[in-house]
């Protein structure tokens, strides 16, 4: 009975501002295993973007995410996408259609994926912005909020 409550509390702690990276492993589109720590805490700000091909709001937000990526990718900003898809081909097709060029990971388990468990993600789109040393500095930045935060951090 307490397990779901504990999972929620732990997930919320894992994405609290100041929390260190809570690591997990998922595969890329070619089936190669990666840890989130392969991308986060490597000396640049990293946005972890939780999304899915079937999520209309996720797809609607993607042009903004792309614009931020293009503006700041050479200034110390990276993105890693975590897909909540269950269909590999739908995931691949969506990244092509949306022009997503940053790394993508998924275990193709939908809402039962490891990322949803570790960070207690219950709705998408959802984001976590990590500092260069791998600590959470913001969550759920969308629209102008993402661009404003990146400008604050990287337009120096």
What does each model-identified segment do?
Residues 1-34:
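Oxidative protein folding and maturation machinery
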Residues 20, 44, 122-124:
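Short, small/polar residue-rich loop motifs at catalytic or cofactor-binding pockets
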Residues 34-35, 137:
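Generic structural signal for well-ordered beta-strand positions
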Residues 44, 50-67:
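Conserved redox-active cysteine motifs that mediate thiol-disulfide chemistry
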Residues 49, 79-83, 105:
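Short beta-strand segments
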Residues 60-98, 110-117, 148:
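Structural microenvironment flanking redox-active thiols in thiol-disulfide oxidoreductases
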Residues 100, 107-155:
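Thiol/disulfide oxidoreductase modules built on the thioredoxin-like
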